[in-house]
Amino acid sequence: MQGYNCIMVYSKDQKSLLFCKRLWDPYEGLYNLVGGKVEPGEDGFEAAYRELEEETGIGRDAIELSHMMDFTYYNQDCTVEVYVGTLHREVDLIPEKHPLCWIPVEGTDFFDIQTFAGEGNIGHMVQQVEIYGRG
């Protein structure tokens, strides 16, 4: 199975979550968490930190990631590892391809599939963090 990751990046004050706005399919026009493909021979944390830096410019020195959960999609022959962390300091975002933005956690319906990618999974992930913490 091909491995992928998505990374939940909370702002330093923990009031906002970092998203990219998809410019093409899958999920064109929707907000998605940053992340990408796990390369052969790469472990999950290496891949998560690499993708985070490639897509946002956020380096290891600015955040500590925890491995929160995994999704296995047998019908798509892939797995998605979910990582979460809170920034230690303010950062300048450097988008790789898709525009980046901070979305407030309070009052946002992350289950809204007309706005957010993932068929409601982002809402599930945010709820898991709110209920059980960041790991």
Regions found by a protein language model. Give the residues of each.
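Short, charged/polar surface micro-motifs in flexible loops or helix N-caps
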Residues: 12-16, 26-27, 39, 76, ...
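Nudix hydrolase/Nudix homology domain
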Residues: 26-30, 94-135
